[in-house]
């Protein structure tokens, strides 16, 4: 069950341009959370911004009761959040949403991360490593300074293959292009994707063509975060029937072949 509470900030670091890693004392979330879920964070003490902001659970340490977030500053809410200092308290609600489905232990899986989309995938790879999966991470960003979490993935013994738009590190091009060249689709039990919409759409199309399963984590604009306001509706196709699902409640993770990409 999700809760609302004030979490004490334990640490804040800027890890890349405009990108912050933040640790909180949050034992209930650390205990309950599964990869792919998110917290809904109140950014600041005043009513501006009024709405909470959804941020994925980046990592948890269950024994220490610690929750970590990794976020990019894009507007007012994330700007205020990035200014919090150790000892400050941040009101949050969570864990929320439906997370990733784990494969059978020992499976060979692919993880595709674009930009800040790497954030929730670190927690996922942590759990995949616990069940001894063989993980290849296809990790992309604009340039080498913007590559995130490569060290964490390597530490968890995942194979990491990098793509940058400008070719300053690894393959020059996009993550889907890299996967087309590198990935052995027939041997991959499951592919997990989080990143820009265009990247998730391209990879979902490739997965459908290769007839292999995948899951994507959708980043929709959210109001309430708990299924009440319908502001996060996404079109999902199930047995040919298209219906609206709430990204905050039935998602944010959906099977890649069910998403109706706009
Ligand atoms: C399930 C989920 C998980 C997310 N996880 C992360 C993460 O781990 N790290 C990270 O950097 N970002 C993440 N985001 C995106 C993050 O929520 C937005 O960047 C943030 O809400 C922007 O708020 P702002 O006040 O800084 O920007 P503003 O542009 O001022 O925000 C205005 C409004 O738009 C909403 N909004 C703006 N951009 C987005 C967006 N991309 N997705 C959803 N709502 C948006 C805000 O919640 C707010 O209501 C996630 C989004 C979702 C839906
Ligand atoms: S954000 Fe309100 S229903 Fe999803």
Swiss-Prot record:
UniProt gene name: pyrK
Location of the FAD-binding FR-type domain: 2-102
Residues binding FAD, per UniProt: 53-56, 70-72, 77-78
Residues noted as binding [2Fe-2S] cluster in the record, renumbered to the chain: 224, 229, 232, 248
Record key words, sorted: 2Fe-2S, Cytoplasm, Electron transport, FAD, Flavoprotein, Iron, Iron-sulfur, Metal-binding, Pyrimidine biosynthesis, Transport
Pathway annotation from the record: Pyrimidine metabolism; UMP biosynthesis via de novo pathway; orotate from (S)-dihydroorotate (NAD(+) route): step 1/1
PANTHER family: DIHYDROOROTATE DEHYDROGENASE B (NAD(+)), ELECTRON TRANSFER SUBUNIT, DIHYDROOROTATE DEHYDROGENASE B (NAD(+)), ELECTRON TRANSFER SUBUNIT-RELATED
Family: Belongs to the PyrK family.
GO biological process entries: 'de novo' UMP biosynthetic process
Cofactor binding: number and manner: Binds 1 FAD per subunit. Binds 1 [2Fe-2S] cluster per subunit.
GO molecular function: 2 iron, 2 sulfur cluster binding; electron transfer activity; flavin adenine dinucleotide binding; metal ion binding; oxidoreductase activity
Record note on quaternary structure: Heterotetramer of 2 PyrK and 2 PyrD type B subunits. However, the metal reductase complex seems to be composed of a heterooctamer of 4 PyrK and 4 PyrD subunits.
Any one GO cellular component localisation term in the record: cytoplasm
General function of this protein: Responsible for channeling the electrons from the oxidation of dihydroorotate from the FMN redox center in the PyrD type B subunit to the ultimate electron acceptor NAD(+). Together with PyrD, also forms a metal reductase complex able to reduce Fe(III)-chelates to Fe(II)-chelates, as well as soluble Cr(VI) and U(VI), using NADH as electron donor. To a lesser extent, can also use NADPH as an electron donor. Is unable to reduce riboflavin and FMN with NADH as electron donor. May have an in vivo role in metal reduction in D.reducens, which is an organism capable of reducing contaminant heavy metals and radionuclides.
Name of protein: Dihydroorotate dehydrogenase B (NAD(+)), electron transfer subunit
SUPFAM superfamilies per UniProt: Ferredoxin reductase-like, C-terminal NADP-linked domain, Riboflavin synthase domain-like
Cofactor(s) the record lists: FAD; [2Fe-2S] cluster
Pfam families: DHODB_Fe-S_bind, FAD_binding_6, NAD_binding_1
Subcellular localization: Cytoplasm
